[in-house]
Every structure is written in C-alpha cells, then in structure tokens.
Amino acid sequence: MPFGNTHNKFKLNYKPEEEYPDLTKHNNHMAKALTPEIYKKLRDKETPSGFTLDDVIQTGVDNPGHPFIMTVGCVAGDEESYQVFKDLFDPIIQDRHGGYKPTDKHKTDLNHENLKGGDDLDPNYVLSSRVRTGRSIKGYTLPPHCSRGERRAVEKLSIEALNSLTGEFKGKYYPLKSMTEQEQQQLIDDHFLFDKPVSPLLLASGMARDWPDARGIWHNDNKTFLVWVNEEDHLRVISMQKGGNMKEVFRRFCVGLQKIEEIFKKAGHPFMWNEHLGYVLTCPSNLGTGLRGGVHVKLAHLSKHPKFEEILTRLRLQKRGTGGVDTAAVGSVFDISNADRLGSSEVEQVQLVVDGVKLMVEMEKKLEKGQSIDDMIPAQK
C-alpha cells in the first residue's frame, strides 16, 4: 500500500474535485469507469484492513495504458475491496468480462475427466502446454496491501501445506532470497519463475514492497507442477510440460490444486471464493477461475494471414508473445490462451483452448501447402 490511512484522512481536507486524478490520456478499464461522482462517493471509504479507493486506482493512474492493450488499471487490497468499492469494480468487471452482471453467478468445474480430447495436439507445432491459476488465502490481505509479517505468515503456511504433498506432487520450496542471480535468471528463462519486479503495474500497486522477502517458488521433482508464493497473488499454481498433451497437463493441474485446497481447508484457511466472483484474486482480470490455459504454438503462415486476429477473437482466444505479456513472438511461436476467466468453468475454458489450437494447427498445415483456409474460418463462439 503506497500510503497509510492517516494520509487518506489528511487528503479529505481537500475537496473531491481537487483530489480527482487526471485521466484524460488514459486507456484502461479503471479510467473508463471512474467518474468524479464515483470518486466523491467512495473516496472516504475504507475496507476493514484500511485499503482505500486511492490505493485501488493508483496503479491505473500511474500507468495510463497501452495504445493496443486495454489494461485493468486497478487492484484489490483484500477480500472486502470488491464489496466496499463495488460501484467502481462492478462496471470494470462488466466491461472486462464480456458483460458479466453484478447479479450473475460464476461456475466452477475442476473435474478433469470432463475435458474432451486434448491429448493429441501435434507436438511438431505445439511446443509446450501450461495451465495456471491464482488463489488467495482467506483471512490475509492481498499482496498490494499486506504487511511484512502477514506476507511471511502466508509463506510459512504455504510451505507447510506444499511440503505435505506426496507422489507425483512431492517437491521442495526455494525461497527467492537464498537464490543466486544466476539460479534466478535460469528459472526465469525456463519460464518456471516470475520475473523480477520491474513491471510498472507491480511497482505502482505496491506489490513489490520488501522484495524478495517471503517470496519463492515450490516445484515437484519433475518440474511439471509449480507454485509461486507471494508474487501478484498469495499463490499461483502452474502445471506445465513440453509438447501438446494438454489433457495430462490439465489432469495434473486439477488433482494438485484440489489437494492443496484440501490441505489449506483442514488448516482452517480456505481460499477466498464467492458465488458471484468465483475465486477472489488481486487483479479483477483474473476473477472467476483465475485460469489461463496456454500453449506455445508455431504458426509461421497463419500469423501472417489477414484474418489471424479475427480467427482468435472468434475462438475466444488471445495471443501473447513467446515470453508472455508485452513480448514479441520469436520464430513465429505464439503463446495462445483462453480470453475468458469469469462466468464459465475451468473445463470450458481449457476446452476452448484445445479445440481452438487444434483448428489453428490444421489451418497452418493447409497454408503450408498453399491451400486456402477460407472455408475453415470458425463462427463466433
């Protein structure tokens, strides 16, 4: 949290219009939703742990946005933020999640057997498969707001829980502060570890305070099941492997995640969840499943096709560069994943990835032979 609450009380000496941020050059969801009226109504409110409206919006004020990417521009500081500041969060959620209304209910389905196919994506094109989500532990504030003691308590709880996993999930925790620069960089390059906190979104929201205190990575012995501790969320759970067997990646994801949830519940610390928002996370873009199922796929021809963007939109998929968000594609390899998080289930979201990527690989093969793909362009899903 950038400011203490005494500072927030002090700001109330000024009129709302004197404190209202200049958002004229901004392109993010928060800037679109925050009117002077909403600012006036919410600015003296705070959550039980003391998170304020100015804390919610600071990252979006400091980062006007990207000309092509619509960022969210706000964060939650605790579970109650979404309720206390709902006049701002509701329109942002509706805008970001395809019209998801304040009365809508989210659905969860972590039964991996409900996924159809997914074990036959062509490994000549699909280089790796990955599914991730975030989880927040009830009773603690979120990374933009938590204190050092709280963050360390989350780490301690997480280590105890993860160290009790057995079988294919047996593994070890590696705290960031005891890693050498080289070890850290190697893990980042292998896509196992989160980047150092250089992202302005992380910095402006206060998530990088005290770095690297109480941050770390836990992974199983095969490095196919990983948990990041105390980055943007309390926990980021990741299942990944080389090749195109998304079915196996999703099975491991569901089984491991449910084991972890069970252990936390038994310890009296369930994950934050409600039937409207699903799993409650720091960034509103991750509400719902928090799930991003993605593959690294080689699309040398399709990526140059004039309808590439339209095909992705119709399949409800999004593309990122090879190194993740805000990076370029190297050697025509794209990171393709589900665009939706809220209002549909985990199984449905991964199904869209499996079916969509399969179709795109078929299109790529046709284009290689110089054939047209016009008859393969899908309808809007």
UniProtKB/Swiss-Prot annotation:
Its EC number is 2.7.3.2. Residues 125-367 form the Phosphagen kinase C-terminal domain. The modification Phosphoserine is found at S164, S178, S199, S372. One of its GO terms (molecular function) is ATP binding. Residues 11-98 form the Phosphagen kinase N-terminal domain. ATP binds at residues 128-132, 191, 236, 292, 320-325, 335. The keyword Transport does not apply. The modification Phosphothreonine is found at T166, T180, T313, T322. InterPro entries: ATP-guanido_PTrfase, ATP-guanido_PTrfase_AS, ATP-guanido_PTrfase_cat, ATP-guanido_PTrfase_N, ATP-guanido_PTrfase_N_sf, Gln_synth/guanido_kin_cat_dom. One of its GO terms (biological process) is response to heat. Dimer of identical or non-identical chains, which can be either B (brain type) or M (muscle type). With MM being the major form in skeletal muscle and myocardium, MB existing in myocardium, and BB existing in many tissues, especially brain. Reversibly catalyzes the transfer of phosphate between ATP and various phosphogens (e.g. creatine phosphate). Creatine kinase isoenzymes play a central role in energy transduction in tissues with large, fluctuating energy demands, such as skeletal muscle, heart, brain and spermatozoa. This is Creatine kinase M-type. It comes from Canis lupus familiaris (Dog). The gene is CKM.
